[in-house]
Amino acid sequence: MSMPFSSLGRYGLALIVVLCLGYLQTASAMSIRELRALKRVNPKQGADFALYYLVGTMEATVNADQAATRAGAAPRICLNGRRLEPSMAVSIYSAELRRNAELYEADMPVALVMMNALATVYSC
């Protein structure tokens, strides 16, 4: 009785699965702890990298809420003509962490904090 996969084929398949899982890991959201570590580990550029990440997270959160609204979900973020600029990302994020410090654990994603912050500041 022959096996459908040779041992080389099984190792190749296992390698592909491991690589795919590795790529899935790189696509995960940054946690609060990782964002703080980014600032500490790289003193010269860490703050800039964190700022870029927060701005991107803020824009992605607004776009995701708008897409969900177009798909029929109730909106959570309503700008209503108020301004939302990239320079506001850090202050909105930091204010949410201060306001609800007991709710957030270090392993929670930054995107969750940003969604709650924007929903609070720009409530519907």
Give, region by region, the residue ranges found by the protein language model.
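Surface-exposed, polar helix/loop patches in the mature regions of secreted/periplasmic/lumenal proteins
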Residues: 88-124
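Bacterial N-terminal signal peptides that target proteins for export
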Residues: 2-13
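Short N-proximal segments of mature Sec-exported proteins
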Residues: 30-94, 117
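N-terminal signal peptide c-region/cleavage motif recognized by signal peptidases
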Residues: 21-26
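Absolute protein N-terminus
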Residues: 1, 28-30
